[in-house]
Regions:
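Ser/Thr- (and often Asn-) enriched beta-sheet segments in non-cytosolic proteins
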Residues: 38-40, 154, 205
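An acidic-aromatic
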Residues: 50-139, 199
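Short small/polar-residue motifs
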Residues: 54-59, 97-100, 144-158, 175-176
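N-terminal leader/targeting segments and the immediate start of mature chains
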Residues: 2-67, 219-233
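Short beta-strand segments that buttress and anchor functional surface loops
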Residues: 39-46, 70-76, 87-91, 113, ...
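Non-transmembrane domains of secretory- and envelope-associated proteins
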Residues: 23-26, 31, 161-165, 171-177, ...
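Conserved beta-strand and immediately adjacent loop positions that scaffold enzyme active sites
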Residues: 100, 110, 177-178, 190
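Solvent-exposed helix/loop surface patches that form functional interfaces
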Residues: 115, 119-166, 190-192, 215-221, ...
Length: 233
């Protein structure tokens, strides 16, 4: 998210060795609020031969109890390109361009992609999650990171543009992670990671959108149910 989604962006939080001293971690209310979000992703890497590569893209996200819906913001020309394939056979699953629906049922995340043009819901088995850039974590899908990881970070006095939101930071062996966490919305507003050598930098900016959209997963009646294996050549 396909560039890695937020879960991959902050994998370092799970593997960095020593846990730093922390201030009191934010309490997690029993029920997280419904959210409609706009998310902007940016990454920059410097290769050993001095080439800088940058990528940026945007998504929308709807969060409801037991449901998370992500959709890539696509340029108009991308839709035109898709229409150019009508009438032909498409190989593979272009999951990066399709809305992603994650459900939490019976303590287990369920993943599907939705092809609106073909009116099809494509179920992804857990054994194939890694092939479609999903790490299988419901918490990271719902909160954009695992809230417990904030306990491994130090709350700093860095100024926050959002009342009540606090910066949580950590650094290990020249690699840093920074999270601006909003305890009211229970979502990170900004996430940054990088190294002091400047070989990589990644940033995610999250903005709450006004209003609450209708749940798109409630509008899939009549869609064909397909399997991921249908798209494997």
């Amino acid at each position: 998210m396909n560039i890695s989604r937020v879960s991959l962006l902050f994998t370092a939080l799970c593997v960095v060795g020593t846990v730093q001293a922390v201030a009191t971690a934010p309490a997690m209310p029993a029920t997280a609020p419904d959210l409609d979000l706009a998310i902007a992703y940016y990454s920059k890497t410097m290769t050993p031969d001095g080439v800088t590569r940058e990528s940026r893209y945007q998504e929308t996200m709807l969060r409801r109890p037991g449901h998370v819906w992500n959709a890539r913001v696509l340029p108009a020309r991308a839709a035109q390109h898709e229409h150019g394939h009508e009438g032909g056979h498409r190989h593979g699953l272009n999951h990066g361009a399709m809305p992603r629906h994650v459900r939490f049922e019976g303590g287990t995340p369920r993943l599907a992609f939705v092809d609106a043009r073909e009116r099809a819901v494509i179920a992804i088995p857990a054994t194939e999650f890694s092939n479609v850039d999903f790490d299988g974590s419901w918490e990271r899908a719902f909160y954009l990171l695992e809230p417990r990881l904030l306990k491994t970070m130090t709350v700093t006095n860095r100024a926050s543009p959002t009342p009540g939101a606090r910066w949580h930071e950590r650094e290990d062996k020249g690699v840093y992670q920074r999270v601006l966490w909003d305890p009211q919305r229970q979502i990170p507003l900004t996430m940054e990671s990088g190294d002091k050598a400047g070989t990589f930098y990644r940033r995610v900016d999250v903005t709450a959108r006004a209003g609450v959209a209708a749940a798109p997963w409630s509008k899939l009646q009549g869609y064909a149910q397909r399997e991921y294996a249908d798209f494997l050549d």
